[in-house]
Swiss-Prot record:
Compartment annotation: Cell membrane
Protein's UniProt name: UPF0182 protein Mlut_14990
Compositionally biased spans, kind Polar residues: 555-565
Start-end of Low complexity biased regions: 1015-1037
Similarity remark: Belongs to the UPF0182 family.
Keyword Cell wall biogenesis/degradation found: no
Tree of life domain: Bacteria
Keyword check for Transmembrane helix: yes
Protein's membrane topology: Multi-pass membrane protein
HAMAP family: UPF0182
Biased composition (Gly residues): 1-27, 49-59
Transmembrane domains' residue ranges: 71-91, 114-134, 168-188, 214-234, 266-286, 314-334, 341-361
Amino acid sequence: MSFGQGGGGPFGGPPRDGGGTAGGQSGPFGAFGPFGGAPRGPGDDGDRGPGGPFGGGGSSAARGRGRPGRPSALVLTIIAVAVLVGLFVVFTNVYTDVLWFSQLGFTEVFWTEVLAKGALFLIAGLGMALAVWLAIRTAWRHRPADASAAARDSLSQVQRQLEPIRRLVFLGVPLVLGVFAGSTAMNGWNTVLLFLNQVPYGQADPEFGLDLMFFMATLPFLTLVVGYLISVVLVSGITGLLVHYLYGAVRVEEGGGVRITPAARAHIGITLAVFLLLQGVNFWLNRYRTTQSQTGNWAGALYTDVNAVIPTSAILAVTAVIVAGLFVWTVVSGRWRLSLIGTAVLVITALVVGTAYPFIVQEYQVKPSERTLESQYIERNIAMTREAYGLDDVEVTNYEGATDTEAGALAGEEANTANVRLMDPNLISQTFGQLQQFRPYYSFPTTLHVDRYEVDGQTRDTILAARDVNVDDSQSWVNRHTIYTHGYGMVVADASEVAAGGRPQWLLSEIPTRGPLASDQDYEPRIYFGHNSPSYSVVGAPEGAPAVERDRPQTADSQEDTAYTFSGDGGPSVGNLFNRLAYAVKFGSPELVLSSDVNEASQILYDRDPAERVRKVAPYLTVDTAPYPAIVDGRVQWIVDAYTTSDQFPYSTAQQLGEVTVDSLSQGQNPALQGRVNYIRNSVKATVDAYDGSVSLYAWDDQDPLLQAWQNVYPSSLRPYSEMSAGLLDHVRYPEDMFKVQRELLGRYHVTDADDFYENNDAWSVPSDPTREEDVKQPPYYMTLQMPGQDEPAFSLTSSYIPQITDGAQQRNVLYGFLSAAGDAGTGEDGVKAEGYGQLRLLELPRSTTVPGPGQAQANFDSNADVSRELNLLRQGASEVLNGNMITLPVAGGILYVQPVYVRSSGGTTYPTLRKVLVSFGDKVGFADTLQEALDQVFDGDSGAVTPEEKQAEAPAPGEKPTAPGTVEEELSAALEEAQDALTQGQERLAEGDWAGYGEQQKRLNEALKRATAADDALGGDAPAQEQAPAEASPAPSSSPSPTPSG
């Protein structure tokens, strides 16, 4: 087959037909080039215009016959309006984002992402569109001289139907594909920025000797680029082939043969050559990807990968390049034979060398001697996994695991026994709500937070929560977005000490807030930014305007509320009409334009969840799901942990975050961490001010290469941790989600010997939560703890291990390990991090241990006859017994379990109160009203332990609610509550004809009313004067709307 006679050689133009002069040299690349001259149609009959797919064609009459009717003016108007509305919606989203980031001071983050995405969209979109357009142009310009005659009848009909809209299609298809390619490429903006700003890791991989950052930054970028180029070549090649086929340059003969014109052959040959070159590059990159594989029991390149897959990938890469050269030879010679043979050889090589050979090596060489051959690669997996997850410096201690008890055994364990957490943050949320909510427009989270504070010179573990705003969606727009805008105050209880009646011992409570910890005068109590804040609030007013925001009750028992006006800089201004219109479109709220409550001084607060705010200003970070509030330097600050992560670290085992971070407390909660990682660092500590929403990002792990790369991208968004105040450092703790990831991996990777790791006979599991019926992991617990060998106690995050749970095997629920992470970062100095922060300590018990695990300890509790009898008594009167968190403590050479037992009476206004404490050491069980008594039962009558100061009054009889609160206000509330309950139960007994029961309830009613009267007298006369409200607060107008609680 010949390429024609226009200019000689493969790029010469084909002969013209009828009326042409010389042939095929008008373009710089001859007939094949996109700018080469096209053959003219026969004569000047107007069937086709001059060369190029966009030239005019045919007579005016012919064009007139093919032209469709014009759309009506109404249709054009509707289309124009729809387009304008769509563009305005897009504009408002971008414009409001600019306002939001600008107000926070993070415009660098916004514009960097926008410019990166925009550049990728343009580059990738134009690249795809240009390639497809050139393919279409080339194929159309070099169609046969009589395309209609060359094509079959069916294709001729398609040509005629396409002709009126041919120019639109030939332009539209490249544009649509370009937009799609550009939109897809935008998702790789962070990959590109990381590649361009990477810094060396400083450690080489064990197989190729390349810096580890090559695998985390360079290899993903190269994969992205090669994948994009392959897509471009494939899409443009297929598009060009379709046009060639449509216009007869590629024809399938009736006998089964295929005829291709020289120009089409050149086009297809060069496309295939480029495609194979890119495949060769892809094969070469596959060599490096073997170090990131996650197949089998171990991660990374194993024996078969190193000795079969990597060499064969190199062979396939060279073969692909050679076959690409054969396709170039096809273009030059016009012969397909060699290129087709080369393609067959490549396919066979891929099947035999790329697939069969590694399979044979694995099955017949590796499997019979797997332990020996894989040993060095397992060592790589162990070392690199421990490096990637920060497990390379775990302090391991062999622990005796004693089970025998004797008097005085806990005499030297004051640091642990004095800080035992008896308040369960998962159970007492309802207690917080009943005793400290005060208004239906306030709420507390389901699970409370754990932190520590210094009170009277001593550091105490505490249970705490912010009193957040809670407004029902059924409320009016004014109520939801301008009246109920914020919560009020922190509520803090001692984690170890218990008040009378089994209720929390408050360190900060009431409204106005007061207590040993602080008062309203010591910090700004208003919570405008929290977990439960409305989607947006409009706040602020001109100077002198009346306050409209519902602030707080004047006192805890007052029916009158104060009003308040936000005075900070917390959100973009909506003081002008354009901004109001933009936000009205963004939130679908025309009230922002129409309401008189929006004025020239108004600000709009939105994206108010602390984790979401950090996620927006630091899109390169994975944000922890458990931000917690702390009073820091006179402000409530949400402390948020954030991580740099990667799934490209060589030889490291990957984890699905959504699976390993789920436990009995986080199950079913959103948002949960998502994605797969095999590298993680707690590189950033962030704070979000609860009053004005300001965000600060601190580079916590400034040695992390990933964080250093992102600091190059965003040089002004991160601050050094040396700028953290001493007060903030005192409340930093070890991050919970990262600890969950680490404890999961350490269950296998505490084994560092390759042979033992291969046998997998010492793998551990995180125990199931013994207080739950379903099989779900026990959560880690924060507590102040002094580990064996530790110089002084530290606020730590802890978890335990039992032997690995395997399907079909009998579970042995004994304790194999205990893990703690030191969380004290403060030193009392600004910007100075404690040296021991983050140290992981692992206690390993003997494999022959009989120390029960948490599940077995719970079973021992449940099967104890004395415990069962006492619990049955507590269940009388329709009361519900609730098991609190199972605390595990390494003391006296063994393991001590402590579990608080709560009782909750039936009824919607009751709450759990601590009634008993369960304790076990070895197989001995103690069950008493106080921790001290329970310990003494276990340790032969005198444990020698120092426990928290007892502040419990005599507990009520079983079935009764506690009636001895710690403050006058609580006394009144509890007395009225019990009076209401006695009245209700008395009526029920009367209806049943139970006169004796009715008489008992009448006695309860009279006693409760006496206590209520006494408390009311105390409030009216001898009670301490209420603190004055802040100067800016004033009584709320009586006409202020009342909220409906959201339940």
